[in-house]
Amino acid sequence: SSSNETANTQTRTITDSIGRQVVLPRNISRAAITNAYNAELITAIGAADKIAGVDYYIYQDQEGFKNRFTENMLIGSRQGGLNYEKIADMNPDVLIICENDSWETAQERLRPFGIPVVVCNSYYTSQFAENTALLGQIFGMEKNAEELSSFFLSRLDYIDKQLKDVPRRSVYFEYRTPGRTTIPGDYFYEMIEKAHADNIFKTAQATQIQIEDVVHKNPAFIVKVSDANVYSSYIPPKKEDMEKIWNDICLRPGWSDMDAIKQNHILLLSHYAHGGASKLVGTMYIAKFLYPDKLPDLHPEEVFKKWVTVYEGLEYQTGHTFPAYELND
């Protein structure tokens, strides 16, 4: 097409999350994307109107994206496979996917159509600044990306400064189902690490552990991402559902003598709240939960409110944590 003949004057090369050099059109007006973490960051830098195609994972949280994604924008199935025919028909300027979305296949299938594929792993907490900058570069929103990054990084710096010489407090982290914890390399590991927690399973070989091992390790705190539903939703869980999850934890065989249970040191986070800003919102809650006395100027609920209202453009809703955090906590 004629647009391709002049492409050499209107392209640029970016480096994606996994170090691939990708040639992109100078202006991106229509992007197909996968993964809610990517969708949230793109929204947070002010480029939501450039999203032309989404996977099922993004599509199903209608309220979280203001119902802007319609069924004809779907590029993937409920099972997570991508529909390359649909993407080719859509002919976006770029497909932005995650490393775990089989990007090699995407690259191969879309090359004949001249649709570039960018890998952006927004679910990795430790890559938040790099991925925000990458998306800022892709959409020409560098200034917004810079502002978003510094909002969160300044708070991480505060946590690091305040807790520099403080012994780490032990935490058992659980994701959704009993015994599903986090280890180095897993999606949740850095969220816990950046909160200066001592993850009791940091040397475990797999993310699924035996429940009785938690008893032996006797953590001082328990943090659980509580929704049984795998999908993230902006609508908070019902309070009675949170209470039931809390009670179920306390009633696990042999757990009543555990320090965390005796002290009522249990924090439940909704899927949505823990995940904000590549899980840095989760980090803020966990840090404050573990070290309330050391972090007087960190207010996680305030951070969550700003994430939701300023960056995602949504109304603030309470109920995403249990026990509830007040704005000034």
For the regions a protein language model found, what residue spans apply to each?
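Structural recognition of the beta-strand scaffold that forms the well-ordered cores
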Residues: 30-34, 52-55, 94-98, 117-121, ...
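Short helix-initiation/N-cap motifs at beta->coil->alpha
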Residues: 17-19, 73-85, 204-211
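Flexible, glycine-rich surface segments
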Residues: 182-257
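Solvent-exposed loop/turn segments at secondary-structure junctions
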Residues: 37-40, 57-60, 94-95, 100-104, ...
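A short, structured surface patch at a secondary-structure boundary
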Residues: 33-90, 94-100
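Short, low-complexity disordered leader/linker segments with a strong preference
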Residues: 1-27
